[in-house]
Amino acid sequence: MKKVLGVILGGLLLLPVVSNAADAQKAADNKKPVNSWTCEDFLAVDESFQPTAVGFAEALNNKDKPEDAVLDVQGIATVTPAIVQACTQDKQANFKDKVKGEWDKIKKDM
């Protein structure tokens, strides 16, 4: 009985690891450039890396070349939650368009 309980408990403990590995593999298979991302692609990124993705999307022009040598780190921290909220409402929208739209709103309020 103890062996069976140990096997069941061990299996339950491994379930989140297997699930996270599948999610990580799915994210690794997605090799689209940031300019081609949908909001769904952005939301699939780990939450701690979302500000970095916003920074890349804001810095790159349509030819995937950097436009500015300086990034507004404080602005990225401010705009990222708004982009997450906007992307949650429309997951099929173009991520770069959402970034531009939310940046415009933030800059207008400054």
Swiss-Prot record:
Induction: Activated by a low pH-induced dimer-to-monomer transition. GO terms for biological process: cellular stress response to acidic pH; chaperone-mediated protein folding. It is found in: Periplasm. Disulfide bonds join 39-87. Keywords: Chaperone, Disulfide bond, Periplasm, Signal. InterPro entries: HdeA (IPR024972), HdeA/HdeB_sf (IPR038303), HdeA_sf (IPR036831), HNS-dep_expression_A/B (IPR010486). Its main location: periplasm. Belongs to the HdeA family. HAMAP family: HdeA. Homodimer at neutral pH. Dissociates into monomer at pH 4. Changes from a highly ordered form at pH above 3.1 to a highly disordered form at pH below 2.5 that is essential for its chaperone activity. Required for optimal acid stress protection. Exhibits a chaperone-like activity only at pH below 3 by suppressing non-specifically the aggregation of denaturated periplasmic proteins. Important for survival of enteric bacteria in the acidic environment of the host stomach. Also promotes the solubilization at neutral pH of proteins that had aggregated in their presence at acidic pHs. May cooperate with other periplasmic chaperones such as DegP and SurA. This is Acid stress chaperone HdeA. It comes from Escherichia coli (strain K12). The gene is hdeA.
